[in-house]
């Protein structure tokens, strides 16, 4: 209250003046405690309280008046008051610390800013984040809330002022107790009290500097008050412009009901005006910084004056004044200056309260003459009584102080020069306080005029609230439509998730298909190996057929030889006929025998020709079968190549399906992003509809909103079509996958059928080859029998000795054949047992080789471990201290190590020999197997030997 300083809307801690002391308290409590703890003697703080905008009584009266007029909700604004510093308070201004380019519309009545408090970092100079729609659409809302916000700020100011009063009372009591104790101590025992007074003097000098800083802060507050007045004037000018706009819009609404109230041009114009005001505030901020620099220079001049005053006082003290007299003189001057300052402050408070009472009475008559309320009048009467009682108490205190001042003046022994200087300072402070009072009066007049304009705008606000309620209904309808669209979007999202799951399943199926394709490729390799084996078998069969053809040719040559023998026999018979003419009967018998032989020969020839034809037919059939088999093999190879190509196509198709799935995922993501963008656009439209100032009829009739809604619906329909197209495409891909799977299954079936066919054909061919062998053997036996019969007949025709020889030979031949057959059976059985034994032997050799290698490895490892152990022992012994023993032990260990190294070398040589033997055995076995494979069968050998 006495010297309290309140800063108005400081920008940042960095925007403070550089000369401000960092110890200067930000809260008013600490400031009052420091300024009024002992009461300084300087007159710089006179009129320091004149920078305040409203007194406590005026605040209480306004609070009571507004409290009875309507409900107040402290809970809605307690957070704002708690966050803001208590040292930043002005009328109609926000308690928050905002930059100079920003106004809190919760305090003022600016129509072009949102009604809620905006953070300082979002509304800086050059960054206007508020849209033009919100600037114009929230005018009635801000006008409605201006009163409530001012009431809340006034309540907070009232609470702070009450706290300050309590603190100041306590400080005054403490000061009085200190002064009384100091006076008593000076009277009783002054020598130790002088030391205390010197310490007090030092404290007073420091407090004088603090008061000077507070005086500078008061000057800054005055400048801020001027800036607030300018801001209020700007706001009033903006309100006038808005009133003109409202009038123009109302006139245009009567003439053209379909046209909207506020066009984009008006919004742009208001936005430009808002930017211009921000620029003006920026310029004001610069001027404020310049004023702070000036204040800094003034502070320096004041410090120089204080130093000169201190020097003069020291000179006066050094001239011969007694310490006690100077101390008493200084104490009296201090008390006198403090009392005069207090009186001046009380006078200013009385004047302010009288003015405030008059203004409150005028406001009471003006606001409540139409609708008087008993509760409001009672509250105002109580407030007035409180004010009167406070005024009377203050007048009594003022009289007491005046009496005290007179007593001090009469008792005091102040020097004339100091009194003149103090009087000059008092006059300067009084003139400055009068100037500030005039400024405050102007501000109050502006505020009263603004209240009248607010009342005028409230009538307009009621008309706009009805329109706003209609627009709210329309917004609710739009909200319902938006919720429906959001539900559709959610359904689409679920469908998209389902599609993703299906795509993942398809990817797993594709992976399975790739695995199956790999398995098919492996099966194809195995089938190719089997086909290669079949080709080898066919080559073997062809070789056998060639051998049979050679045998047939040999048989034909033998038949030719037999015919030659027959012709020779005939010649002998003819010679015998010529020689033995006597034996006709023998000749006839011989002729008959010859005829029989010729018949048998012809029959044999016919049978031979028939056999040759049958053999040729069988050979032709075999050749045809071979050709068919080759064709089938080529067909199988073609099918395999086709299957390989189809497998490659399937892989490419699977990769294309995977790429298409990825494309679908990206497309679905783009669709989701587009849906989110459309949702954001819908939300923006909703906010625009909320902030719009038009009525529901104009909003429904406005073509822009309907077009926007239709456009959104069209876009949603388009997105639905795109999602349906994506669904159809996914279904198409699924069908393609099913077709591919069916084709793969068909091809698998075909491959299995071909494998079964090839196996059957191989079996049939083996059977045919076996039948051919059997037939050949039977034919050979038959031909041999026939030849034997022919020989017998020839031998019977010849001498009996020859017959006996032929019979013996035939018997020997049969025995040899039987022996050969038994030998063949034995040979086959022995070959089988030999093969089994060879396999068993190879297995045993492999096991023996493994065991030997393991044993050699174990021995080598054991030897290496022993050698490493010996090396470690040798190293330890070499490191030990005793030399003789260690040398002997080292030598013994080295001998053992050499022996182990020799054993290791021998083991490695044995292992190398074993590996070489194994290699030679394998090489010998492979060469032997090749020889056995290329060696002809014993049947062939026998047949060739027989017919050689």
UniProtKB/Swiss-Prot annotation:
The modification Phosphothreonine is found at residue 38. It is a peripheral membrane protein. Changing residue 948 to D: Abolishes RIMS1 and RIMS2 binding. Residues 144-920 form a coiled coil. It holds the Pfam family Cast. Residues 1-54, 773-801, 903-948 are annotated as: Disordered. The modification N6-acetyllysine is found at residue 10. Changing residue 946 to D/A: Abolishes RIMS1 and RIMS2 binding. The modification Phosphoserine is found at residues 17, 21, 37, 55, 75, 94, 796, 937. Residues 13-28 have a biased composition (Low complexity). It is found in: Cytoplasm, Cytoskeleton, Microtubule organizing center, Centrosome; Cytoplasm; Membrane; Golgi apparatus membrane. Its main location: cytoplasm. Residues 773-796 have a biased composition (Basic and acidic residues). GO terms for molecular function: PDZ domain binding; small GTPase binding; structural constituent of presynaptic active zone. Keywords: Acetylation, Cell junction, Cell projection, Coiled coil, Cytoplasm, Cytoskeleton, Golgi apparatus, Membrane, Phosphoprotein, Protein transport, Synapse, Transport. GO terms for biological process: maintenance of presynaptic active zone structure; protein transport; regulation of calcium-dependent activation of synaptic vesicle fusion; regulation of DNA-templated transcription; regulation of presynaptic cytosolic calcium ion concentration; retrograde transport, endosome to Golgi; synaptic vesicle priming. Changing residue 945 to D/A: Abolishes RIMS1 and RIMS2 binding. Residues 40-51 have a biased composition (Gly residues). One of its GO terms (cellular component) is GABA-ergic synapse. Interacts with the GTB-bound forms of RAB6A isoform 1 and isoform 2 and with RAB6B. The interaction was strongest with RAB6B, followed by RAB6A isoform 2 and weakest with RAB6A isoform 1. Part of a complex with CHUK, IKBKB and IKBKG. Interacts with CHUK, IKBKB and IKBKG. The interaction with IKBKG is independent of CHUK and IKBKB. Interacts with NFKBIA. Isoform 1 interacts through its C-terminus with the PDZ domains of RIMS1 and RIMS2. Interacts with ERC2/CAST1. Interacts with SDCCAG8. Regulatory subunit of the IKK complex. Probably recruits IkappaBalpha/NFKBIA to the complex. May be involved in the organization of the cytomatrix at the nerve terminals active zone (CAZ) which regulates neurotransmitter release. May be involved in vesicle trafficking at the CAZ. May be involved in Rab-6 regulated endosomes to Golgi transport. This is ELKS/Rab6-interacting/CAST family member 1. It comes from Rattus norvegicus.
